[in-house]
Amino acid sequence: MTKTWPPRTVIRKSGGLRGMRTLESALHRGGLGPVAGVDEVGRGACAGPLVVAACVLGPGRIASLAALDDSKKLSEQAREKLFPLICRYAVAYHVVFIPSAEVDRHGVHVANIEGMRRAVAGLAVRPGYVLSDGFRVPGLPMPSLPVIGGDAAAACIAAASVLAKVSRDRVMVALDADHPGYGFAEHKGYSTPAHSRALARLGPCPQHRYSFINVRRVASGSNTAEVADGQPDPRDGTAQTGEGRWSKSSHPATMRATGRAQGT
């Protein structure tokens, strides 16, 4: 009988870090390692960059990351404590920042998929298999699997989610100093009531995404749109859901963070 990959593995989300390693361990046993996890932060924000991280965790270094979990379930303090540990113990990691203008130009989904491809391509160690959080990532030169709720089911995805979240939060704090009055340090660019009030008072800044209807509504001086605040405008071509890729000449000028653990 022909074997297929990945194997049918039971993911026990309540099993702590050991449960999160089940799928990765099965892939390693099948000779498909190293296994990279990839995740993004900032899809739903109406301001600030979309941040994508890829991370490879070594099987022998997991004990140092006992507190690892989905970044959304961790406090800011816990994420900040985990961030340097992940950078230290990861076999490799790479973080890509996609500016708001590029998100507007290509659409959130296309930008997200391209960011995942670029994050994986930027790893110092070539993975044998890639696990992504929920989204299929076409165009990778190695096999991959989208895992629904992956940041709570696979340790490498959880690590990538922490890297992306902390990296983006730090950028938003810095942008708060560059663009005072919007409260970026507090809401991180998401559409909170405080952000909406500041946006109405000050108007959009260069960090806002004009493909989001609440930003466009303020920019145009119109308040008659019936599309929910903080969502991409479905009437706008930039809100497409296709899986297109950018040409080489149109890759966004992004900031990057790359690392490889010492001794690997």
Curated annotation (Swiss-Prot):
UniProt: a divalent metal cation binding residues: 39-40, 133
The keyword Nuclease appears for this protein: yes
Cofactor binding, per record: Manganese or magnesium. Binds 1 divalent metal ion per monomer in the absence of substrate. May bind a second metal ion after substrate binding.
Function: Endonuclease that specifically degrades the RNA of RNA-DNA hybrids.
Protein's organism: Mycobacterium bovis (strain ATCC BAA-935 / AF2122/97)
Family annotation (Pfam families): RNase_HII
Family statement: Belongs to the RNase HII family.
Stated name of the protein: Ribonuclease HII
Family annotation (InterPro entries): RNase_HII (IPR022898), RNase_HII/HIII (IPR001352), RNase_HII/HIII_dom (IPR024567), RNaseH-like_sf (IPR012337), RNaseH_sf (IPR036397)
EC number: 3.1.26.4
Region of interest: Disordered: 222-264
Chief site of localization: cytoplasm
One GO-annotated biological process of the protein: mismatch repair
